[in-house]
Amino acid sequence: MVWFFEYYDGCGLAIKVKKKLYEAEGVQKVEIYETESMGKMLVIDGKIQLTELDEPFYHEMLVHVPMLSHENPRKVAVIGGGDGGALREVLKHNVERAVLVDIDRNVIDLSRKFLKIDHGAFEDERVEIAIMDGKEFLRDCEIFDVIIVDSTDPVGVSDTLFDREFFELARQKCDVISLQSQSPLIQKEYFRTLLVNSAPFERRDVYLSCVPTYPLALWSFIIGGEYDFSNLEERFERIKGKTVHYNPDVHRAAFALPEWLKKEVEACI
């Protein structure tokens, strides 16, 4: 048995692993592990992206909050998310078309082979896969009801998904957007930058989820655009029985921010 360590901003996380299943170098360094207590684990460029144990706490909140805040989402784009978790959640809704845009085919191929958390989403006839930069995709793409940004940390190949131009393009291409916005506890500069750069979505809010394998477990998301939280119970009937974590009570509670975080958000929006 060996331990996998991830270090960030003066602290870290250790996870006992049984074995490394695969490692590949390309656009990014992709590693997949079998862990002692958290199932399979995906690591990109040294950063934990998911474990089987807690990935629903992330993917369900990233996807169902915007999807159930839209009256009738039919066309959805997932930017990033090559592991297939977000795509899996999107397809629980009655969508007509879902486009997955990821710059790194390795992530998709290795996730399909080793992780298999997509539960067949990659083979769904409603799905189209585009291997390209997310910002470049937005320049010429069609209009979507919802865009979901499931990116890695805002460095390296993902940094173009966090600048002001990205959000200016996205605002022209969707009704509602959601994105992960890092740890508001120890990644404050990233968090603040995302709040500021997402200003093309004049209406936007922050919400939270607990994701134990992410830095300090408290993880933030931003939703922007023309979202509507009424009729959550009625809309939840679309996916009732299909979620592990998400429900309307969790949805509403996620927007109850502690006072220190309210001040952070108000200072940036």
UniProtKB/Swiss-Prot annotation:
What processes does the entry annotate via GO biological process terms?
A: spermidine biosynthetic process
Residues bound to spermidine are 59, 83, 150-153
Q: Where in the cell is it found?
A: Cytoplasm
- What's its EC? 2.5.1.16
Q: Which Pfam families match?
A: Spermine_synt_N (PF17284), Spermine_synth (PF01564)
On whether Thylakoid is a keyword of this UniProt record, the answer is: no
Q: Which CDD domains match?
A: AdoMet_MTases (cd02440)
Which positions does UniProt annotate for S-methyl-5'-thioadenosine binding? 28, 102, 133-134
Domain named PABS is located at 1-226
Active-site residue list: 150 (proton acceptor)
Give the GO molecular function terms. Answer: spermidine synthase activity
Matching entries from InterPro entries are given as: PABS (IPR030374), PABS_CS (IPR030373), SAM-dependent_MTases_sf (IPR029063), Spermi_synthase (IPR001045), Spermidine_synt_N (IPR035246), Spermidine_synt_N_sf (IPR037163)
**Family (UniProt):** Belongs to the spermidine/spermine synthase family.
This chain's function reads: Catalyzes the irreversible transfer of a propylamine group from the amino donor S-adenosylmethioninamine (decarboxy-AdoMet) to putrescine (1,4-diaminobutane) to yield spermidine.
Name assigned to this protein:
Polyamine aminopropyltransferase
Organism taxonomic ancestry = Archaea, Methanobacteriati, Methanobacteriota, Archaeoglobi, Archaeoglobales
What is this protein's gene name? Answer: speE
